[in-house]
Amino acid sequence: TSDLASASIHKVNFGKFDRKIGVIELRKFYGSSGSGPKATDDVEELLEKLKAEETEGVILDLRRNGGGYLAEAINLAGLFISRGPVVQVKSTDGKIRKKFDFNPKLAWDGPLIVLVSRYSASASEIVAGALQNHKRAIIVGDKTTHGKGTVQSLIQMNLPFNFNASSGKKSAAKITIQKYYLPSGKSTQIQGVESDISMPTINTYLPIGESDLDNALPCDSIAPVNFRRPASEFVYELDDIQHLKEKSLERQQLLPEFVYLNKDVNWYKNKREETTLSLNLQNRRDQKIKNQKFSDSMSDDFEILSKNAFGRKDINLNIVDIQNTKSREVRGEDIDDSNATNLYKSPSNFDIRLHETCRVMSDWVGMIESRNLTHKKPELKDEI
């Protein structure tokens, strides 16, 4: 169950009260034509549980999602839009197929943020890009996603001399057969999906993107898909993004956790840029001591920062709860943990970028509330 979607609720301090921000982490778009679990069904189940907890905003965490089934990506995007295009697929013969979500049902119609990184690739870029094109979600995270906008297929090779015949292995070649394009017509290849609000990360300096590969196909564009969204569908306003970005940048310049993050990123960046290595034994020993002192200092700082983490409560899929209960029964443990599961606990690992994304969502919810109060019509009272 480690690859299944999971969720949590974070209590974000907002003035005199707390906001409940839901987070759904999805590491792959799993699913098949069989009876096994499907990413879309699991995310929909978690969204229902988050709504039952009166969550005010949802963050879809795709930072570790390298892709998966295209059909699941399309269906999952459909949980947040009523109808409309999700992706365009261009084949080697030049034919373009437009993939739509036709299901009008919405699993979540409130504020939505998609949290991404340079490791968010392929199908996760389709979901992030489509929701951005629909003005349905704000993208937060690394400056861009991975940039994998192509589809490969394994082609069996019939060789005149099959050197692997004795081992039973067959030769094959992986051939690029299709290319992905967003509803706007822009390809996700090389450039990926650009975040509306970005944060410092060492991923910027690592050769982990599609653009770092040899002979990667270029980014291009095709005609956009024209579509109309229902007037009642929740969408963000451009002014919202600018305001949220300014507030986030202000925090990134002032808060201790970003001082820590920038210090960490700069250290790794400088290490990667070093082009010489001393052969003097004493110099190497001195450098090792220096590195260890830096590491110890950063660990101490991180432990202090971790005390500021928001309270968190995990939300499990039904199948996960059932398996956890069975495991406790086997170990002879108390299975009545209803009180424990309702408690908000300090997370075991302080996630600075998720922490800031929760703040961005809290700011956004506050802006929406203020706007609704401003536009709310006064009630008319009958005169006596």
Where are these regions (language model features)?
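Mixed-charge, polar/low-complexity N-terminal
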Residues: 3-4, 61, 67, 87-88, ...
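Generic structural signal for residues positioned in beta-strands
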Residues: 23, 85, 111, 172-176, ...
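A general structural signal for short secondary-structure boundary/capping elements
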Residues: 104-108, 161-165, 219-227
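Conserved functional hotspot residues or short segments at active or partner-binding sites
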Residues: 183-381
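Cleft-lining beta-strand/loop regions that shape enzyme active-site pockets
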Residues: 1-162, 346, 350
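Polar, glycine-rich mid-to-C-terminal structural blocks
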Residues: 123, 135, 140-210
